[in-house]
Amino acid sequence: MRVYRMLRSRVIPVLLMREKGLVKTVKFKEGKYVGDPLNAVKIFNEQEADELTLLDIDASRLGHEPDYVLIERIASECRMPLCYGGGIKTVEQAERILKLGVEKVSLSSAVFENPKIITQLAERVGRQSIVVCLDVKKRLFGSKFDCFTINGTKKQSVDTIEFVKQIQTLGAGEIVLNFIDNDGVMKGYDLDAVSKFKALVKVPLTVVGGAGCVDDIAKLVQQEKLVGAAAGSLFVFKGKYKAVLINYPSPSEKKKALEL
């Protein structure tokens, strides 16, 4: 397996899309409307975000194809690298999305149904364009994590540790760990769990779930030396009453957070 040298750390907003609008969930439930995706992209452009992840959380659940027209509009507006996930089941769908100007595709449900899609896609477009996103939840008893799909509603019958190893062997260029229990809680990342997973990962690793302030990002990056620190609520809410306000750390805040 190829071992990656340390890349520059990135602070990544994660936007959840439902019915062409943006929502923010808590522990993968509910879904508060937080705005229009094109408007959000324009704001993140102005604030010079490192990268942007857009996930259509209804596409796989409802069996929809990706909304190629909207994806193309968003990609054409985006002045930062864009990763898209949601409803991707085939190599052809993934290739079509990449041709729209998207830099990376994020696979989730598809890798459990057909793990070989990772290898097939890597051979066609290169592993650098392939992200595997694992939605993980800690078991009630013990320290093990299970993988879920379909917005956290379908538990997958895989050994999570072994699956993390397998997807790297198959050609995943990046792994995103999305901690379900931390989603929208804004009380910090699960650093102990991140540390255990990081020991298994030889490709770039991004973590999402739990960030409530820039200091949380700093702790994650500085302790675990991760390539990606991602967040949702942190970048769409502001203040103790969580007013909807698209935001991103200032250059000085980000520089301080990413000091290694």
Swiss-Prot record:
It is found in: Cytoplasm. It comes from Vibrio vulnificus (strain YJ016). Heterodimer of HisH and HisF. GO terms for cellular component: cytoplasm. One of its GO terms (biological process) is L-histidine biosynthetic process. Keywords: Amino-acid biosynthesis, Cytoplasm, Histidine biosynthesis, Lyase. The active site is at residue 135. IGPS catalyzes the conversion of PRFAR and glutamine to IGP, AICAR and glutamate. The HisF subunit catalyzes the cyclization activity that produces IGP and AICAR from PRFAR using the ammonia provided by the HisH subunit. It catalyses: 5-[(5-phospho-1-deoxy-D-ribulos-1-ylimino)methylamino]-1-(5-phospho-beta-D-ribosyl)imidazole-4-carboxamide + L-glutamine = D-erythro-1-(imidazol-4-yl)glycerol 3-phosphate + 5-amino-1-(5-phospho-beta-D-ribosyl)imidazole-4-carboxamide + L-glutamate + H(+). Pathway: Amino-acid biosynthesis; L-histidine biosynthesis; L-histidine from 5-phospho-alpha-D-ribose 1-diphosphate: step 5/9. InterPro entries: Aldolase_TIM, His_biosynth, HisF, IGPS_HisA/HisF, RibuloseP-bd_barrel. Belongs to the HisA/HisF family. It comes from the Bacteria. This is Putative imidazole glycerol phosphate synthase subunit hisF3. The keyword Signal does not apply. NCBIfam families: AglZ_HisF2_fam. Its EC number is 4.3.2.10.
